């Protein structure tokens, strides 16, 4: 699911939803769900400060469902309220909804920062947003480019190529 909670940058959600579906298929996650929330620089800066203790906005944040309580889960994702808080960070089996879908977590993206990166990298905003979605999904799966000695970067490069994002 793609949610747009910002108004600064015009974004077509449907192509991003189709891309997200394609990423999930490519990674064998067709029975998994996640939420991508497009938000303002101010909102993502608040989350960045609260959860990473870093000042200022960032391009993408990921909140894996199994590892931590997501600030987005109670408001927007299929897991709401007490059920989300109760199941977060217990190290148990992934919560399966009645449909058999595993909820992976939430990704927050700043389209304003994505637009700046798109200009810098000389590519369309839509491509930059897709790159950030892919990056966020890999974080939801447990990859961490800051600690995994290049494993996430290698996988991301390979997937970018397969998904036409090079």
Residue ranges and their predicted role:
Residues 1-130, 138-166:
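An acidic/histidine-cluster motif and surrounding catalytic segment
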């Amino acid at each position: 699911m793609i949610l747009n909670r910002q108004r600064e940058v015009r974004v077509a959600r449907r192509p991003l939803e189709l891309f997200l579906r394609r990423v999930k298929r490519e990674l064998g996650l067709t029975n998994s769900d996640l939420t991508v929330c497009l938000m303002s620089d101010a909102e993502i800066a608040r989350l960045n400060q609260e959860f990473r203790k870093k000042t200022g906005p960032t391009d993408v944040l990921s909140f894996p469902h199994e590892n931590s309580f997501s600030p987005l889960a109670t408001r927007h994702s299929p897991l709401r309220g007490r059920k989300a808080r109760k199941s977060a960070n217990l190290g148990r089996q992934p919560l399966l909804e009645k449909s058999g879908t595993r909820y992976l977590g939430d990704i927050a993206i700043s389209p304003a920062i994505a637009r700046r990166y798109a200009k810098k990298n000389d590519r369309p905003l839509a491509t930059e947003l897709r790159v950030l979605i892919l990056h966020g999904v890999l974080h939801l799966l447990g990859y961490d480019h800051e600690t995994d000695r290049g494993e996430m970067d290698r996988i991301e490069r390979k997937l970018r190529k397969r998904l036409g994002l090079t």
